[in-house]
Amino acid sequence: MQKNAYTFEELLACGRGEMFGPGNAQLPAPPMLMFDRIVRIEAEGGKYGKGYVEAEFDIRPDLWFFDCHFIGDPVMPGCLGLDAMWQLVGFFLGWSGGPGRGRALGVGEVKFTGQVTPDIKKVVYKIDLKRVIMRKLVMGIADGVLEADGKVIYETSDLKVGLFTPEQMA
C-alpha cells in the first residue's frame, strides 16, 4: 500500500534515490527542494479525478534566497515556486510507479498575484493532475496553485513533467 503523506526525512531519501529505485524519479536536495513535507497524495483525487498532491513549505526569514533576491527587498523568486510544482508532479509520477528520471517540460500559463516575503509563515502547494500517461512516454499534466498563509498568489495551468529512461535521454 502506498503512503499518502511524506516527512522531510523521507523527501531527503527520495532526493538520494532511495524511494523509487535506482534511475527513477528523485527530488532535488536542499536548498532546491522547495517544500518540507507532502501532506496528501492521492491517485484518483483532485478536481479532475486523476490525482492530487498537497505539500507545505515553512517560510523562515533565514531562507537562502531572501539574502540575495533582493538586497533590501527580500522575496522568494517566483521561479522557485514554479519549480516546486514541477517537483511535485515528478514525485507523483514516481509514486505512481512510472520509470525514469523527471524533467520539467513546460507550463501553459503562470499568473503571480502576490509574493512570498519573510513575514509569510507557510506556503501550501496544491497540484491537480489533469492527465497521467504511463506508456513508453511517462508524463503528467497538472494545474497548480501556491497559497501563502491561505491566500492563492500563484496559479499555473498545464504544468508538464516527463520521466525519461537513460536510453530516452541519450
UniProtKB/Swiss-Prot annotation:
SUPFAM superfamilies referenced in this protein's UniProt entry, alphabetically: Thioesterase/thiol ester dehydrase-isomerase
UniProt subcellular location: Cytoplasm
Active site, per annotation: 69
CDD domains xref list: FabA
BP GO annotations: unsaturated fatty acid biosynthetic process
UniProt GO MF annotations: (3R)-hydroxyacyl-[acyl-carrier-protein] dehydratase activity; trans-2-decenoyl-acyl-carrier-protein isomerase activity
Pathway the protein acts in: Lipid metabolism; fatty acid biosynthesis
GO cellular component entries: cytoplasm
Reaction equation(s) it catalyzes: a (3R)-hydroxyacyl-[ACP] = a (2E)-enoyl-[ACP] + H2O; (3R)-hydroxydecanoyl-[ACP] = (2E)-decenoyl-[ACP] + H2O; (2E)-decenoyl-[ACP] = (3Z)-decenoyl-[ACP]
InterPro entries given in the database record: FabA, FabA_FabZ, HotDog_dom_sf
Catalytic activity, EC: 4.2.1.59, 5.3.3.14
Alphabetic keyword roster: Cytoplasm, Fatty acid biosynthesis, Fatty acid metabolism, Isomerase, Lipid biosynthesis, Lipid metabolism, Lyase
Predominant cellular place of this UniProt entry's protein: cytoplasm
Function of the molecule: Necessary for the introduction of cis unsaturation into fatty acids. Catalyzes the dehydration of (3R)-3-hydroxydecanoyl-ACP to E-(2)-decenoyl-ACP and then its isomerization to Z-(3)-decenoyl-ACP. Can catalyze the dehydratase reaction for beta-hydroxyacyl-ACPs with saturated chain lengths up to 16:0, being most active on intermediate chain length.
Similarity field: Belongs to the thioester dehydratase family. FabA subfamily.
Complex formation: Homodimer.
Name of the molecule in the record: 3-hydroxydecanoyl-[acyl-carrier-protein] dehydratase
Lineage: Bacteria, Pseudomonadati, Pseudomonadota, Alphaproteobacteria, Caulobacterales
